[in-house]
Amino acid sequence: MELNAGGVIAYISSSSSASSPASCHSEGSENSFQSSSSSVPSSPNSSNCDANGNPKNADISSIDGVLKSDRTDCPVKTGKTSAPGMTKSHSGMTKFSGMVLLCKVCGDVASGFHYGVHACEGCKGFFRRSIQQNIQYKKCLKNENCSIMRMNRNRCQQCRFKKCLSVGMSRDAVRFGRIPKREKQRMLIEMQSAMKTMMNTQFSGHLQNDTLAEQHDQSALPAQEQLRPKSQLEQENIKNTPSDFAKEEVIGMVTRAHKDTFLYNQEHRENSSESMPPQRGERIPRNMEQYNLNQDHRGSGIHNHFPCSERQQHLSGQYKGRNIMHYPNGHAVCIANGHCMNFSSAYTQRVCDRIPVGGCSQTENRNSYLCNTGGRMHLVCPMSKSPYVDPQKSGHEIWEEFSMSFTPAVKEVVEFAKRIPGFRDLSQHDQVNLLKAGTFEVLMVRFASLFDAKERTVTFLSGKKYSVDDLHSMGAGDLLSSMFEFSEKLNALQLSDEEMSLFTAVVLVSADRSGIENVNSVEALQETLIRALRTLIMKNHPNEASIFTKLLLKLPDLRSLNNMHSEELLAFKVHP
């Protein structure tokens, strides 16, 4: 009697009277079963079966005893099953909803789902050895038409291997089913190499486009220029290709923008010894003097980094609920809905007209989070002057003091963004959305140097250092710890000013920000900045190609920090 390999045996007893078991057949792991009138026992030679292979007793207990005694001569390993509802008995049988699954190759009881099909331990090991050892079996003497069953599966190995492939066993599943650690590392290296090749292919495509444009321009050159030796022209073009010109120009412009707009970095280096940090708990006068826009202030030192620390002009009327902070250079910062944007005065008015007025109270201008522990209010953000705030101050005064110290840093981010090549070509709507969503991440990158991993200290903008333990005792929570961890990893890369400026631009210009209208334009600018960053990294670190990959992996970390920051602000309520 020939067994139908790959079937599933189901035992059904509707009454106490004797009845023959019905067999169901399944193709693969699909759960569609087809009834058949012929019974398919798991072991025809069992002592509990008659000459036709049918069980002597039809009750479920005796049949279960047949199955349990069937494979006692061949111990198998039990493992996890892949499908829900699938169980495995102590003898190695795989059951699905009470039905026993058979090996797709030989019809024996399947021990699990191996290499893409349900198979027994014998066929699983046979197929694995065949693939791993690349065994070439002897040719079949019966024209490769042998019937593979449990009793004769070892007679013709070529037909057995052919049957394994025909029922769906996968060669790749043998090679990559359970990947060792070294193999995974090797595959990751290959994937990174493939990514580099793909990027180089994209770069070559851009170079071809540049070459076509160059040929078009050369067609309009004078005849004498066209008659110059081709080799001489090629040598000149190799030295400075149009693509290289573009990348170098982007690198130079972004670097200059970063240096010119990151005033804290310059003043901290040049005037740290001249500037005196404010005392802890320093109060700001309640009666704010209105700032005279016509007055010229050209001070130096870290105090000048906060030009509106004692000067602020509040507008009323149509801008009620929005704080407009003016600066001597004719620019202003609009703080609305917790976001800070810096543009010219006319530009600020246009932007503010688009921002809803509702829900813009002082308590919603949350550019850092406050902690209320034991009745004492503390400000624990490095972008402020000090983590300490006088507990006698009202919530309004606390936010006012913080916004005064924090807003100029945001102003610098906006100035930096405006000087990124191509940023101002984006729509006004997309510029605002990129600044809203990315300002915190840019500041996180810029002020990463404030975190000292060795001393476990954080330097605030006032110049004072505080230990992490002290900040935690003041109420700093998981956000500050995550900021410290990120800064430690970023500082370990030891990026130059050029590399830091390009990375900051890449952080800001992200096409997956919410609310972007022209995604293609933002993506094009983002790709330009990423290519420039990669060129700079490869130039400065030819033997450390992983730095570029590590930098790109910092982008999701920054996004997580941004989300944590937003959650902290939304969860906190200022108590006046």
From Swiss-Prot:
Domain of life: Eukaryota
Subcellular location: Nucleus; Cytoplasm
Region feature (Interaction with ZNHIT1): 394-576
Stretch list, region Disordered: 13-90, 215-246, 263-282
Biased composition (Basic and acidic residues): 227-237, 263-272
N6-acetyllysine PTM sites in chain numbering: 162-163
Record feature DNA-binding region, as residue ranges: 100-176
GO cellular component terms, semicolon-separated: cytoplasm; nucleoplasm; nucleus
Modulation of this protein's activity: The heme-bound form can bind gaseous signaling molecules such as CO and nitric oxide (NO) and NO can reverse its transcriptional repressor activity.
Boundaries of every NR LBD domain copy: 366-576
Key words of the record: Acetylation, Activator, Biological rhythms, Cytoplasm, Disulfide bond, DNA-binding, Heme, Iron, Metal-binding, Nucleus, Phosphoprotein, Receptor, Repressor, Transcription, Transcription regulation, Ubl conjugation, Zinc, Zinc-finger
Compositional bias (Low complexity): 13-47
Region (Required for phosphorylation by CSNK1E and cytoplasmic localization): 1-60
Zinc finger region(s), NR C4-type: 103-123, 140-164
Primary localization: nucleus
GO BP annotations, alphabetical order: circadian behavior; energy homeostasis; lipid homeostasis; negative regulation of DNA-templated transcription; negative regulation of inflammatory response; negative regulation of transcription by RNA polymerase II; positive regulation of DNA-templated transcription; regulation of circadian rhythm
Example GO molecular function: cis-regulatory region sequence-specific DNA binding
Phosphoserine: residues bearing it: 46
Disulfide bonds: 334-340, 371-381
Family assignment from sequence similarity: Belongs to the nuclear hormone receptor family. NR1 subfamily.
Domains (record comment): Composed of three domains: a modulating N-terminal domain, a DNA-binding domain and a C-terminal ligand-binding domain.
Subunit structure: Binds DNA as a monomer or a homodimer. Interacts with NCOA5 coactivator, leading to a strong increase of transcription of target genes. Interacts (via N-terminus) with KAT5. Interacts (via C-terminus) with HDAC1. Interacts with ZNHIT1. Interacts with SIAH2.
Cited function: Transcriptional repressor which coordinates circadian rhythm and metabolic pathways in a heme-dependent manner. Integral component of the complex transcription machinery that governs circadian rhythmicity and forms a critical negative limb of the circadian clock by directly repressing the expression of core clock components BMAL1 and CLOCK. Also regulates genes involved in metabolic functions, including lipid metabolism and the inflammatory response. Acts as a receptor for heme which stimulates its interaction with the NCOR1/HDAC3 corepressor complex, enhancing transcriptional repression.
This protein's name: Nuclear receptor subfamily 1 group D member 2
Organism: Mus musculus (Mouse)
